[in-house]
């Protein structure tokens, strides 16, 4: 059996791959005297996704460093955060979290017997804790409470009082769990500094705070439980993992906001200390990297292709997910998963008839599912001389068939392999016997001779990337636009091409995360 790690080695294990440590000198002093007591808490809201492997890998580091580790399932916090977890589902979601987090830890070889698991409501409803909540509320300003939760608590126009209580409860958890340190994402920083300011006001000591970086989602932004395309669920099927990775932003040579590279850096490398790029012999064969920066350097130099990177991540990720899928393949856990996260489409529909005081539906651009597409093939419609039948990759498992009236305006060879902009949530429509599963959006100018140009997404775009109107990127598109409600038609009335050839809605630009959607030359044109 090897020697116990020295205080310096423990410090290295505890702090490696962290973005920031608050209270490092205090941490060093504790490690000279005894083992560190640390906790990680997770509010039991949306389904945990693969980015949760980041804290799991750090928990493995803490155990290697001899730390006493507590995992808190913060059920009360989940309810306080704008009721992200309804009260009637709170117990079910907490049970789901406990089972899935334990399955994750087992899949990376973490011994569960060395961990302490606790629910927030096991102690947060006690007389002593409740009294401290009141004591804290007497010294905390509304401004500080709101500021502390800004990165974590859901921000709404008229915030509930519960969201202002959230940071205070998280601060008190440090005292009631009797720990030296709290570990969390860097998005928790304002809550951590809030705790450092206010716990001493109650006579409690200031704790050490350890922060890991936030892993970008597959779309390049923060990986989020509420943004479906940005994350891979722990129970996603292999085909879903493949589909989501295929749509992930991973531009050749671009290492900025690259969710695929970031996942390798913060999850796969810490767990395995190496990463293997799988590729055909004709492209150089497999290559093993033991230093992440070497892989990043090769990707930046385009020695490693995005396709090979994604395929290699897919294989490595499925090895982590297989034990979790297997564990949840039992009747009891399948029932738990469906009960904790009921399918909204299967909920009981509201009673027929107009609801009293119902508000009209908002007609806003985020209701449109517009995506970057790549035309894989173009053929003349067999029964219509003016129509093309295109197969377009829009980031799904199979390409979509789209019929468009471009024969008179755009040569076939200009469309082949072209990146285009496709409206994907129109109701499929038969066009001269062929089902069209989308609309290829184009700019047009009427006149003596009508001119039409397909809209162009920014250079470097990938099929499946979302196209949105600036300022409306957060909303979820309708599953399918209902023809009778004419949502697209109402919005289209304000579509226009600017003098700079940028596609706009009410003078606000259409864009992707890489830049603006444009056309070649039709200034002032319409969009259809």
From Swiss-Prot:
A motif ('HIGH' region) lies at residues 44-52. It comes from Mus musculus. The modification N-acetylglycine is found at residue 2. It holds the Pfam family tRNA_bind. This is Tyrosine--tRNA ligase, cytoplasmic. It catalyses: tRNA(Tyr) + L-tyrosine + ATP = L-tyrosyl-tRNA(Tyr) + AMP + diphosphate + H(+). Tyrosine--tRNA ligase that catalyzes the attachment of tyrosine to tRNA(Tyr) in a two-step reaction: tyrosine is first activated by ATP to form Tyr-AMP and then transferred to the acceptor end of tRNA(Tyr). Also acts as a positive regulator of poly-ADP-ribosylation in the nucleus, independently of its tyrosine--tRNA ligase activity. Activity is switched upon resveratrol-binding: resveratrol strongly inhibits the tyrosine--tRNA ligase activity and promotes relocalization to the nucleus, where YARS1 specifically stimulates the poly-ADP-ribosyltransferase activity of PARP1. The modification N6-acetyllysine is found at residues 197, 206, 474, 482, 490. Belongs to the class-I aminoacyl-tRNA synthetase family. Homodimer. Interacts (when binding to resveratrol) with PARP1; interaction stimulates the poly-ADP-ribosyltransferase activity of PARP1. One of its GO terms (cellular component) is nuclear body. Trans-resveratrol binds at residues 39, 170, 173. Gene3D superfamilies: HUPs, Nucleic acid-binding proteins, Tyrosyl-Transfer RNA Synthetase. It comes from the Eukaryota. InterPro entries: aa-tRNA-synth_Ic, NA-bd_OB-fold, Rossmann-like_a/b/a_fold, tRNA-bd_dom, Tyr-tRNA-ligase, Tyrosine-tRNA_ligase_regulator.
């Amino acid at each position: 059996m090897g020697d116990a790690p020295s205080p310096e080695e423990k410090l290295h294990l505890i702090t490696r791959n962290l973005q920031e440590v608050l209270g490092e000198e205090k941490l060093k002093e504790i490690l000279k005297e005894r083992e560190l007591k640390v906790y990680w808490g997770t509010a039991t809201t949306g389904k945990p996704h693969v980015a949760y492997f980041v804290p799991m890998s750090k928990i493995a580091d803490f155990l290697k460093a001899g730390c006493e580790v507590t995992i808190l399932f913060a059920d009360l916090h989940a309810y306080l955060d704008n009721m992200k977890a309804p009260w009637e589902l709170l117990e079910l979601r907490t049970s789901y979290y406990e089972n899935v987090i334990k399955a994750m830890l087992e899949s990376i070889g973490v011994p569960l017997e060395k961990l302490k698991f606790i629910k927030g409501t096991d102690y947060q409803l006690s007389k002593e804790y409740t009294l401290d909540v009141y004591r804290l509320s007497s010294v905390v300003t509304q401004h500080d409470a709101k500021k502390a939760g800004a990165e974590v608590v859901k921000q709404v126009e008229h915030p509930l009082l519960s969201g202002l209580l959230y940071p205070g409860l998280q601060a008190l958890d440090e005292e009631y769990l009797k720990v030296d340190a709290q570990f969390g994402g860097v998005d928790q920083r304002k809550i951590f500094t809030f705790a450092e300011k206010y716990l001493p006001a109650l006579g409690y000591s200031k704790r050490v705070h350890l922060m890991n970086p936030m892993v970008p989602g597959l779309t390049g932004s923060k990986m989020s439980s509420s943004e479906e395309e940005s994350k891979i669920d722990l129970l996603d099927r292999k085909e879903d993992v493949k589909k989501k990775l295929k749509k992930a932003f991973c531009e050749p040579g671009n290492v900025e906001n690259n969710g695929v590279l970031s996942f390798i850096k913060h999850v796969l490398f810490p767990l395995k200390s190496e990463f293997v790029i799988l590729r055909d012999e004709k492209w150089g064969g497999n290559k093993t990297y033991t230093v992440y920066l070497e892989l990043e350097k090769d990707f930046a130099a385009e020695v490693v292709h995005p396709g090979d990177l994604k395929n290699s991540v897919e294989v490595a990720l499925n090895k982590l997910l297989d034990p979790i899928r297997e564990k949840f393949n039992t009747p009891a856990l399948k029932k738990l998963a469906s009960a904790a996260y009921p399918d909204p489409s299967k909920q009981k529909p509201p009673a027929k008839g107009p609801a009293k005081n119902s508000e009209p539906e908002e007609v806003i651009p985020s209701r449109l599912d517009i995506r970057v597409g790549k035309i894989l093939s173009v053929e003349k419609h067999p029964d219509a001389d003016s129509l093309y039948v295109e197969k377009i990759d829009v980031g799904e498992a199979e390409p979509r068939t789209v019929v468009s009236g471009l024969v008179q305006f755009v040569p076939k060879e200009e469309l082949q392999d072209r990146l285009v902009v496709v409206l994907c949530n129109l109701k499929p429509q038969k066009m001269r016997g062929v089902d069209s599963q989308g609309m290829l959006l184009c700019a047009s100018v009427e006149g003596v001779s009508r001119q039409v140009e397909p809209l162009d997404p920014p250079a470097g775009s990938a099929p499946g990337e979302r196209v949105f109107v600036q300022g409306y990127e957060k909303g979820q598109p309708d599953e399918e636009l209902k023809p009778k409600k004419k949502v697209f038609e109402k919005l289209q009335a304000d579509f226009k091409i600017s003098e700079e050839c940028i596609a706009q809605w009410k003078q606000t630009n259409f864009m992707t995360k890489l830049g603006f959607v444009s056309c070649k030359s039709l200034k002032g044109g319409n969009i259809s």
